[in-house]
Regions:
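Active-site-adjacent "subsite" loops/lids of carbohydrate-active enzymes
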Residues: 177, 242-257
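Secreted/periplasmic carbohydrate-active enzymes, especially glycoside hydrolases
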Residues: 1-234, 257
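Conserved radical SAM core fold
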Residues: 182-187, 241-247
Length: 257
C-alpha cells in the first residue's frame, strides 16, 4: 500500500506530503496548524520505535520528483520488467508484461537501431551480445507493441556475482570507487534537474569513479537511467534514516552481519 496524497487544507497524516509526525507506535494522532486529527485504525503497521532526527543533511519536504500526467488507451501496457540470463554464447531476455498484452510483439534493437531479435513471447534470445561493462556501457532497447499501445525500455546485459574476495561484473573483479551522494543542488534544492544530473555524472567520470551510493533513499528514475548510460554501478539504499535504537530482534534472520 505505497500511496501518498497531496492535500491543500494543511492536514497531515500518514499518507500526505509531508507526512504527519509519529511520536510513538501508540500515537493515533497527527498534528497541523489547525489542531489534532485522529488517524483511523491500523496503528500496528507503524514502528513502535521513536524516530530520532539526526540527519547530517537537510531533509527537504515536498515533491522531489517530476510529476507527469498522460493518457492511455483502454487496453494498454502498464509496465514491463526485463530480466537477462547468461547462457553460453546466447543471452536470454525475458520480459514480464503488466497490462493487456495478448497480441504483443517483442523486438530488441541495438545502439545502431538494428533489430537483433524479435518474437511474440516474452522470452527471446540474443547471440553474442555486447555486454554492459563498468565505465563502458552498452544498452539495447526492447520495444513491446500491441494493437493499441507501445512501450520501450532500455536495458544492458551483464552478469553480477561476488565472493568473499571481490565483486565481479561479467566475471571480472571490480574495485568500487565512488561516493555517497545526495539529490540536491545549492541553487534549486531538491527538485530534479536534468542538466544538474548530467553535470554530476560528468564529474564522477572526470574523477574516475565507477559507483555511487544513494544516501539515504532511492534516487529518481532519471538518475538510474543515466547510471545505465554512463556504465556506473549504484548502491541503492532504502528510504530509511534516523531510525535508531532498534533492537536486534527487529530484523531477525533478515539481518546481514
Amino acid at each position: 500500500n505505497n500511496r501518498l496524497t497531496v492535500v491543500i487544507d494543511n492536514r497531515l497524516d500518514y499518507h500526505t506530503l509531508p507526512s504527519g509526525r509519529i511520536v510513538n507506535g501508540n500515537d493515533l494522532f497527527v498534528y497541523d496548524q489547525l489542531g489534532k486529527y485522529a488517524v483511523s485504525g491500523d496503528k500496528d503497521r507503524f514502528p513502535k520505535e521513536k524516530q530520532i532526527i539526526n540527519h547530517d543533511f537537510y531533509n527537504y519536504t515536498g515533491i522531489h520528483r517530476s510529476v507527469l500526467i498522460y493518457s492511455l488507451p483502454e487496453k494498454h501496457i502498464d509496465d514491463i520488467v526485463i530480466r537477462t540470463v547468461v547462457n553460453g554464447d546466447y543471452h536470454a531476455v525475458s520480459a514480464e508484461l503488466k497490462g493487456d498484452g495478448t497480441d504483443a510483439v517483442y523486438t530488441v534493437t541495438d545502439e545502431n537501431d538494428e533489430i537483433v531479435s524479435s518474437g511474440r513471447t516474452g522470452g527471446i534470445y540474443i547471440k553474442d551480445p555486447h555486454l554492459w561493462q563498468v565505465g563502458k556501457s552498452y544498452l539495447y532497447t526492447l520495444t513491446v507493441r500491441t494493437a493499441t499501445d507501445c512501450y520501450r525500455e532500455k536495458f544492458g546485459i551483464r552478469k553480477i556475482s561476488f565472493d568473499d574476495r571481490s565483486l565481479y561484473v561479467n566475471d571480472e573483479p571490480v574495485y568500487l570507487k565512488g561516493f555517497g551522494m545526495h539529490e540536491d543542488f545549492p541553487v534549486i534544492g531538491k527538485g530534479n534537474n536534468s542538466a544538474v544530473n548530467i553535470r554530476d555524472f560528468e564529474l564522477l567520470k572526470w574523477i574516475n569513479a565507477n559507483c555511487f551510493r544513494t544516501s539515504h533513499y532511492p534516487y529518481a528514475e532519471e538518475i538510474m537511467d543515466l547510471a545505465d548510460e554512463y556504465g556506473m554501478l549504484v548502491v541503492d539504499e532504502v528510504p530509511a534514516v534516523g531510525c535508531n535504537n532498534w533492537p536486534d530482534y527487529t530484523y531477525g534472520k533478515d539481518r546481514l552481519d
